[in-house]
């Protein structure tokens, strides 16, 4: 029986291949709308088709496994604008990204506020939050928010579908 202050080793310590990490827990989320306003005109655009996107989210510490957020989304066609567009998911993740905004914010905060180098920050995210982020990805996120980039990624993208 473990008591307070006893060392309990991380069962994943020493694993060198991503394939050997625990299998992720899948959580399903739907953004499938039958109709939504067009990006330019605001008229109702019916659902044209649908899709699915998998995002890496912060892990579940109770089960000690990573979490993959499987997002079902709808694609629409506006007859007035004559444009195809997907439902806006920028509140969950940046366009084209594989990680949720929560993971990106936490990774940047660990490096900037806590002063951790990129490699230890990657291990910290896995050990404490059960999300695997390569250290080079963290470096890209941090540098994109600094003076080299044009600022952090946009939270709300204007002109989606243009």
Where is each model-derived feature located?
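Short, conserved DNA-binding cores of transcription-related domains
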Residues: 1-83, 87-90
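Short, positively charged, Gly/Tyr-enriched micro-motifs
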Residues: 59-161
